[in-house]
Amino acid sequence: MTKQYKNYVNGEWKLSKEEIKIYAPATGEELGSVPAMSQEEVDYVYASAKAAQKAWRALSYVERAEYLHKAADILMRDAEKIGAVLSKEIAKGYKSAVGEVIRTAEIINYAAEEGVRLEGEVLEGGSFDPASKKKIAIVRREPVGLVLAISPFNYPINLAGSKIAPALISGNVVALKPPTQGSISGLLLAEAFAEAGLPAGVFNTITGRGSVIGDYIVEHEAVNYINFTGSTPVGEHIGHLAGMRPIMLELGGKDSAIILEDADLDLAAKNIVAGAYGYSGQRCTAVKRVLVMDSIADKLVEKVSALVNNLTVGMPEDNADITPLIDTKAADYVEGLIKDAQEKGAKEVISFKREGNLISPVLFDNVTTDMRLAWEEPFGPVLPFIRVNSVEEAIEISNKSEYGLQASVFTNNFPLAFKIAEQLEVGTVHINNKTQRGTDNFPFLGAKKSGAGVQGVKYSIEAMTTVKSTVFDIAK
């Protein structure tokens, strides 16, 4: 019998009347089960968190940081054990899975240190109005309250930790809703916080069926802030449900790599392949299309093709570069995009092969803007080359996307690179590097349908706190 994992609620590990079985995407093996919470159980989670917040926010930043450092140490200690489970649960290469756990520990440590550095300020009224020179404002940041953190399947530990740590160090309490496929990993993350000795109710987990609690956990009046990573349609729905409450949304992307004629093509090819095919393309920041000057396209396609042909395809425990996609629905969607490109005349440089959820890397040249692959986010190991004749055309195609997460520009002309970066409608532009999240002290954000709000440790702390001003009139 497989293990029954429990939710961490108000300092206790709890089962529910119903459960959800979790299976490995690569093999179909049953990995265990997680509780399927009811709405009444969600009520208890939120009530417990609310009750714990007063004492938690009363602690100093230094005291809260001690708990976070302990949790980070535990994650580092157990990185290989947790990584092995994570690798099976989401079909991620073992080394990458362990790396995700380690990076999460690093984020938690950094968040603890960043919180300790937070400072308030004192303002003098006379700086604006001579008649107010006797007024002084003390400005501080305060926690928003209860943060609902919703993490995605592709980084169920890292993109949980990047929400939890800034929230906790700020004096907030947290309810983590991990993805169904990734929920075991999320509960293992919770074990680290539990062992670190956080006071009961400060950090809690919620697992369950979307049909039962999906909207309920978001709409609940107890929630003060919603921090979500996932698809754009779900993010838009959450935004509607949130009403006037603040939200952080990290959503989809269609990141372009723009390759100019003077670019180092070996460097570009290396970054394109790493950016497009890492974790089988299941990353919001993956390179999802290459906009290349026609005069150098043949050379670049040849270099990229050679590197793609060297990628290994197989199982996560073997550290294969390309592993099975998260489920059959995802693989079917990717296949649909590929067939559309085939039917409309794209050149298949590396042909489509599929075995179950495992899709071998696919490379297309001569993709045109009437093809779905030019615009839709595949979340799979397929990359389209779109040939362009000018910088202006590349910018125009990139900006026509409904998404605006990131872009890359490869060129040795740095004044031109900055000029292009200014015109691209995205949150981040990488020069001579692949699109990617991080480092985690940098701001991370999306324009248009790629998100709302700014992440990055310091920015997340600011987002999950609110400013309070106390004004003294010393003349009185």
Curated annotation (Swiss-Prot):
Temperature effects on activity: Optimum temperature is 60 degrees Celsius.
Transmembrane segments annotated in the record for this chain: none
Keywords of the record: NADP, Oxidoreductase
Annotated catalysed reactions: D-glyceraldehyde 3-phosphate + NADP(+) + H2O = (2R)-3-phosphoglycerate + NADPH + 2 H(+)
Residues involved in substrate binding: R103, N154, Y155, R283, C284, T285, R437
Annotated positions binding NADP(+): 151, 177, 180, 215, 230-251, 377
Domain of life: Bacteria
PROSITE patterns registered for this protein in UniProt: ALDEHYDE_DEHYDR_CYS
Class of the enzyme per the UniProt entry, highest EC level: oxidoreductase
InterPro entries assigned: Ald_DH/histidinol_DH, Ald_DH_C, Ald_DH_CS_CYS, Ald_DH_N, Aldehyde_DH_dom, ALDH-related_metabolic_enz
Disulfide bonds: none
Any one GO molecular function term: glyceraldehyde-3-phosphate dehydrogenase (NADP+) (non-phosphorylating) activity
EC number in record: 1.2.1.9
Active site feature: E250, C284
Signal peptide positions (record): none
Variation of activity with pH: Optimum pH is 8.5.
Functional note: Catalyzes the irreversible NADP-dependent oxidation of glyceraldehyde-3-phosphate to 3-phosphoglycerate. Is not able to use NAD instead of NADP. May play an important role in NADPH production in S.equinus.
Other comments on record: S.bovis does not display glucose-6-phosphate dehydrogenase (G6PDH) and 6-phosphogluconate dehydrogenase (6PGDH) activities, indicating that it does not have the hexose monophosphate pathway.
Quaternary state and interactors: Homotetramer.
Family: Belongs to the aldehyde dehydrogenase family.
Name by which UniProt lists this protein: NADP-dependent glyceraldehyde-3-phosphate dehydrogenase
Gene source species: Streptococcus equinus
Gene: gapN
